[in-house]
Protein backbone atom coordinates (compact mmCIF):
# COMPACT_ATOMS: atom_id res chain seq x y z
CA UNK A 1 0.00 0.00 0.00
CA UNK A 2 1.35 3.44 -0.92
CA UNK A 3 2.03 5.91 1.88
CA UNK A 4 -0.17 8.54 0.20
CA UNK A 5 -3.23 6.34 -0.20
CA UNK A 6 -6.40 8.27 0.61
CA UNK A 7 -4.81 11.69 0.07
CA UNK A 8 -5.69 14.20 -2.64
CA UNK A 9 -3.22 16.62 -4.21
CA UNK A 10 -3.55 19.34 -6.82
CA UNK A 11 -0.62 19.67 -9.25
CA UNK A 12 -0.49 23.20 -10.64
CA UNK A 13 1.73 23.97 -13.62
CA UNK A 14 2.21 20.68 -15.43
CA UNK A 15 3.17 21.38 -19.05
CA UNK A 16 4.83 18.33 -20.60
CA UNK A 17 6.27 14.89 -19.92
CA UNK A 18 9.64 16.57 -19.34
CA UNK A 19 8.38 18.94 -16.66
CA UNK A 20 9.37 18.49 -13.03
CA UNK A 21 5.67 18.59 -12.17
CA UNK A 22 5.13 15.45 -14.26
CA UNK A 23 7.88 13.61 -12.38
CA UNK A 24 6.27 14.64 -9.10
CA UNK A 25 2.84 13.54 -10.30
CA UNK A 26 4.17 10.10 -11.28
CA UNK A 27 5.74 9.61 -7.87
CA UNK A 28 2.58 10.70 -6.04
CA UNK A 29 0.49 8.38 -8.20
CA UNK A 30 2.85 5.48 -7.49
CA UNK A 31 2.21 6.10 -3.79
CA UNK A 32 -1.54 5.82 -4.44
CA UNK A 33 -2.44 9.50 -4.14
CA UNK A 34 -5.50 10.85 -5.95
CA UNK A 35 -4.47 13.69 -8.24
CA UNK A 36 -5.97 16.74 -9.85
CA UNK A 37 -4.19 18.91 -12.41
CA UNK A 38 -4.19 22.56 -13.39
CA UNK A 39 -2.79 23.90 -16.67
CA UNK A 40 -2.48 27.42 -17.99
CA UNK A 41 -5.32 27.58 -20.51
CA UNK A 42 -7.81 25.69 -22.67
CA UNK A 43 -5.33 25.64 -25.54
CA UNK A 44 -3.17 23.00 -23.83
CA UNK A 45 -5.86 21.34 -21.72
CA UNK A 46 -6.50 18.55 -24.22
CA UNK A 47 -2.77 17.74 -24.36
CA UNK A 48 -2.51 17.67 -20.56
CA UNK A 49 -5.58 15.43 -20.25
CA UNK A 50 -3.92 12.91 -22.55
CA UNK A 51 -0.61 13.25 -20.70
CA UNK A 52 -2.09 12.45 -17.28
CA UNK A 53 -4.59 9.86 -18.50
CA UNK A 54 -2.49 6.94 -17.11
CA UNK A 55 -2.84 8.51 -13.64
CA UNK A 56 -6.61 8.05 -13.79
CA UNK A 57 -7.50 11.63 -12.92
CA UNK A 58 -10.80 13.15 -13.94
CA UNK A 59 -9.65 16.63 -12.88
CA UNK A 60 -7.84 18.81 -15.41
CA UNK A 61 -8.69 22.47 -14.85
CA UNK A 62 -7.39 25.73 -16.30
CA UNK A 63 -6.23 28.84 -14.49
CA UNK A 64 -4.50 32.08 -15.40
CA UNK A 65 -2.72 32.72 -12.09
CA UNK A 66 -2.17 36.39 -12.95
CA UNK A 67 -5.90 36.95 -12.44
CA UNK A 68 -7.47 36.70 -8.96
CA UNK A 69 -10.92 36.02 -10.40
CA UNK A 70 -9.48 33.07 -12.32
CA UNK A 71 -7.89 31.72 -9.14
CA UNK A 72 -11.18 32.04 -7.26
CA UNK A 73 -13.02 30.25 -10.08
CA UNK A 74 -10.44 27.46 -10.07
CA UNK A 75 -11.30 26.47 -6.53
CA UNK A 76 -15.04 26.91 -7.07
CA UNK A 77 -14.73 24.43 -9.94
CA UNK A 78 -12.52 22.10 -7.90
CA UNK A 79 -15.06 22.22 -5.08
CA UNK A 80 -17.58 20.53 -7.36
CA UNK A 81 -15.38 17.41 -7.22
CA UNK A 82 -13.31 17.75 -4.03
CA UNK A 83 -14.80 19.47 -1.00
CA UNK A 84 -11.47 19.08 0.80
CA UNK A 85 -7.97 18.05 -0.25
CA UNK A 86 -4.55 17.46 1.29
CA UNK A 87 -2.19 19.81 -0.46
CA UNK A 88 -0.86 21.22 -3.68
CA UNK A 89 2.29 21.39 -5.76
CA UNK A 90 3.06 24.85 -7.15
CA UNK A 91 5.19 24.31 -10.27
CA UNK A 92 4.73 27.68 -11.94
CA UNK A 93 7.46 30.09 -12.99
CA UNK A 94 7.66 32.62 -15.77
CA UNK A 95 10.00 35.29 -17.04
CA UNK A 96 10.11 36.58 -20.63
CA UNK A 97 13.02 35.07 -22.53
CA UNK A 98 14.82 38.36 -23.15
CA UNK A 99 15.61 38.71 -19.44
CA UNK A 100 17.54 35.41 -19.32
CA UNK A 101 20.54 36.91 -21.04
CA UNK A 102 23.39 39.36 -20.51
CA UNK A 103 24.05 41.85 -17.75
CA UNK A 104 21.49 41.89 -14.95
CA UNK A 105 21.26 45.67 -14.55
CA UNK A 106 21.40 46.42 -18.27
CA UNK A 107 18.54 44.05 -19.04
CA UNK A 108 16.16 44.44 -16.11
CA UNK A 109 12.99 46.54 -16.45
CA UNK A 110 10.12 47.30 -14.13
CA UNK A 111 7.84 45.21 -16.35
CA UNK A 112 10.21 42.22 -16.31
CA UNK A 113 10.64 42.47 -12.55
CA UNK A 114 6.91 42.66 -11.90
CA UNK A 115 5.80 39.81 -14.15
CA UNK A 116 8.56 37.49 -12.91
CA UNK A 117 7.58 38.05 -9.28
CA UNK A 118 3.83 37.98 -9.92
CA UNK A 119 3.82 34.64 -11.74
CA UNK A 120 6.76 32.90 -10.08
CA UNK A 121 6.25 34.01 -6.47
CA UNK A 122 2.94 35.72 -5.72
CA UNK A 123 0.95 33.03 -7.53
CA UNK A 124 1.88 30.53 -4.79
CA UNK A 125 0.55 32.86 -2.09
CA UNK A 126 -2.56 33.74 -4.10
CA UNK A 127 -3.43 30.09 -4.75
CA UNK A 128 -2.96 29.09 -1.11
CA UNK A 129 -4.96 32.07 0.11
CA UNK A 130 -7.85 31.09 -2.16
CA UNK A 131 -7.95 27.41 -1.14
CA UNK A 132 -7.07 27.73 2.56
CA UNK A 133 -10.51 26.70 3.79
CA UNK A 134 -10.48 23.62 1.54
CA UNK A 135 -7.28 22.19 3.02
CA UNK A 136 -7.52 19.26 5.40
CA UNK A 137 -5.75 19.21 8.74
CA UNK A 138 -2.08 18.20 8.25
CA UNK A 139 -2.09 19.29 4.62
CA UNK A 140 1.23 19.97 2.91
CA UNK A 141 2.06 22.63 0.32
CA UNK A 142 5.09 22.48 -1.96
CA UNK A 143 6.78 24.76 -4.46
CA UNK A 144 9.88 24.52 -6.66
CA UNK A 145 12.94 26.74 -6.43
CA UNK A 146 16.54 26.87 -7.64
CA UNK A 147 19.94 27.85 -6.20
CA UNK A 148 19.88 31.04 -8.26
CA UNK A 149 17.81 32.43 -5.39
CA UNK A 150 20.89 32.33 -3.15
CA UNK A 151 23.83 32.62 -5.54
CA UNK A 152 24.51 34.50 -8.75
CA UNK A 153 23.96 32.22 -11.75
CA UNK A 154 24.95 33.69 -15.13
CA UNK A 155 21.91 34.77 -17.18
CA UNK A 156 19.41 33.68 -14.50
CA UNK A 157 19.07 37.36 -13.63
CA UNK A 158 15.68 38.58 -12.41
CA UNK A 159 14.39 35.03 -11.95
CA UNK A 160 16.92 34.69 -9.13
CA UNK A 161 15.18 37.54 -7.35
CA UNK A 162 11.77 35.97 -7.95
CA UNK A 163 12.93 32.62 -6.54
CA UNK A 164 14.38 34.39 -3.48
CA UNK A 165 10.97 35.98 -2.98
CA UNK A 166 9.32 32.59 -3.40
CA UNK A 167 11.55 31.02 -0.74
CA UNK A 168 10.79 33.88 1.65
CA UNK A 169 7.07 33.32 1.07
CA UNK A 170 7.54 29.66 2.05
CA UNK A 171 8.81 30.77 5.46
CA UNK A 172 6.11 33.36 6.04
CA UNK A 173 3.30 31.06 4.89
CA UNK A 174 4.66 28.30 7.11
CA UNK A 175 4.35 30.73 10.02
CA UNK A 176 0.80 31.74 9.08
CA UNK A 177 -0.46 28.20 8.51
CA UNK A 178 1.35 26.38 11.29
CA UNK A 179 -1.51 26.91 13.73
CA UNK A 180 -3.73 25.03 11.28
CA UNK A 181 -1.24 22.14 11.08
CA UNK A 182 -0.52 22.97 7.44
CA UNK A 183 3.09 22.71 6.29
CA UNK A 184 4.83 24.67 3.53
CA UNK A 185 8.15 23.70 1.93
CA UNK A 186 10.17 24.10 -1.25
CA UNK A 187 12.44 21.83 -3.26
CA UNK A 188 15.51 23.40 -4.86
CA UNK A 189 16.81 21.10 -7.57
CA UNK A 190 19.71 20.78 -9.96
CA UNK A 191 19.22 22.32 -13.40
CA UNK A 192 16.83 19.97 -15.22
CA UNK A 193 16.24 19.84 -18.97
CA UNK A 194 12.71 21.13 -19.44
CA UNK A 195 10.99 23.25 -22.07
CA UNK A 196 11.35 26.32 -19.84
CA UNK A 197 15.03 25.81 -19.03
CA UNK A 198 16.09 26.40 -22.61
CA UNK A 199 15.02 30.03 -22.34
CA UNK A 200 18.18 30.55 -20.26
CA UNK A 201 21.21 31.48 -22.33
CA UNK A 202 23.99 28.86 -22.02
CA UNK A 203 21.75 26.56 -20.00
CA UNK A 204 23.78 23.48 -20.95
CA UNK A 205 26.96 25.13 -19.65
CA UNK A 206 25.22 25.92 -16.36
CA UNK A 207 24.00 22.34 -16.13
CA UNK A 208 27.44 20.92 -16.91
CA UNK A 209 29.07 23.15 -14.30
CA UNK A 210 26.57 21.95 -11.70
CA UNK A 211 27.29 18.34 -12.61
CA UNK A 212 31.08 18.81 -12.48
CA UNK A 213 30.96 20.39 -9.02
CA UNK A 214 28.41 18.00 -7.47
CA UNK A 215 29.45 15.26 -5.05
CA UNK A 216 27.26 12.60 -6.64
CA UNK A 217 28.06 11.91 -10.27
CA UNK A 218 24.63 11.00 -11.56
CA UNK A 219 22.13 13.37 -13.12
CA UNK A 220 19.20 14.43 -10.96
CA UNK A 221 15.95 13.43 -12.66
CA UNK A 222 12.39 14.62 -12.29
CA UNK A 223 11.67 11.21 -10.72
CA UNK A 224 14.33 11.89 -8.04
CA UNK A 225 12.64 15.18 -7.28
CA UNK A 226 9.25 13.48 -7.33
CA UNK A 227 10.29 11.00 -4.66
CA UNK A 228 11.41 13.81 -2.34
CA UNK A 229 8.17 15.64 -3.08
CA UNK A 230 6.16 12.55 -2.11
CA UNK A 231 7.98 12.44 1.21
CA UNK A 232 7.40 16.15 1.89
CA UNK A 233 3.71 15.87 1.03
CA UNK A 234 3.24 12.82 3.23
CA UNK A 235 2.79 12.35 6.97
CA UNK A 236 6.34 10.96 7.05
CA UNK A 237 7.57 14.58 7.12
CA UNK A 238 5.21 16.05 9.72
CA UNK A 239 8.08 17.82 11.49
CA UNK A 240 9.32 19.70 8.41
CA UNK A 241 7.96 23.13 7.46
CA UNK A 242 9.31 26.45 6.24
CA UNK A 243 12.26 24.66 4.66
CA UNK A 244 14.03 24.56 1.32
CA UNK A 245 15.18 21.00 0.61
CA UNK A 246 18.00 20.64 -1.91
CA UNK A 247 17.88 17.83 -4.45
CA UNK A 248 21.07 18.66 -6.33
CA UNK A 249 23.64 15.94 -5.58
CA UNK A 250 25.31 18.23 -3.03
CA UNK A 251 26.08 21.09 -5.42
CA UNK A 252 24.66 23.72 -3.05
CA UNK A 253 27.40 23.01 -0.49
CA UNK A 254 30.31 22.31 -2.85
CA UNK A 255 33.25 24.58 -3.65
CA UNK A 256 35.65 23.83 -6.51
CA UNK A 257 34.90 20.14 -6.04
CA UNK A 258 35.95 19.35 -9.61
CA UNK A 259 39.62 20.31 -9.13
CA UNK A 260 41.86 17.23 -9.18
UniProtKB/Swiss-Prot annotation:
Sequence similarity: Belongs to the short-chain dehydrogenases/reductases (SDR) family. FabI subfamily.
One Gene Ontology MF term: enoyl-[acyl-carrier-protein] reductase (NADH) activity
Gene Ontology biological process terms from the UniProt entry: biotin biosynthetic process; fatty acid elongation
Pathway: Lipid metabolism; fatty acid biosynthesis; Cofactor biosynthesis; biotin biosynthesis
SUPFAM superfamilies: NAD(P)-binding Rossmann-fold domains (SSF51735)
Active site: residue positions: 146 (proton acceptor), 156 (proton acceptor)
Classification via InterPro entries: Enoyl-ACP_Rdtase_NADH (IPR014358), NAD(P)-bd_dom_sf (IPR036291), SDR_fam (IPR002347)
Assembly behavior: Homotetramer.
Entry EC number(s): 1.3.1.9
Protein name: Enoyl-[acyl-carrier-protein] reductase [NADH] FabI
Taxonomic lineage of the native organism: Bacteria, Pseudomonadati, Pseudomonadota, Gammaproteobacteria, Enterobacterales
Keyword vocabulary terms for this entry: Biotin biosynthesis, Fatty acid biosynthesis, Fatty acid metabolism, Lipid biosynthesis, Lipid metabolism, NAD, Oxidoreductase
Its job: Catalyzes the reduction of a carbon-carbon double bond in an enoyl moiety that is covalently linked to an acyl carrier protein (ACP). Involved in the elongation cycle of fatty acid which are used in the lipid metabolism and in the biotin biosynthesis.
Binding positions (NAD(+)): 13, 19-20, 40, 64-65, 92, 163, 192-196
Cross-referenced Pfam families: adh_short_C2
CDD domains hit by this protein: ENR_SDR
EC supergroup of this enzyme: oxidoreductase
Residue(s) at site: Involved in acyl-ACP binding: 204-205
Catalyzed reactions: a 2,3-saturated acyl-[ACP] + NAD(+) = a (2E)-enoyl-[ACP] + NADH + H(+)
Amino acid sequence: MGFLKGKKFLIIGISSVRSIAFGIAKSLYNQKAELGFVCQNEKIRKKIKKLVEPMKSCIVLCCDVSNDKNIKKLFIDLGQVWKKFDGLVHAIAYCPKQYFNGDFIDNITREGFNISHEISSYSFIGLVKACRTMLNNFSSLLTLSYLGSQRVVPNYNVMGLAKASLEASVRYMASSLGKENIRVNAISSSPIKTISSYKITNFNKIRNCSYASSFLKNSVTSENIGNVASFLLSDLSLGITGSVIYVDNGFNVSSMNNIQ
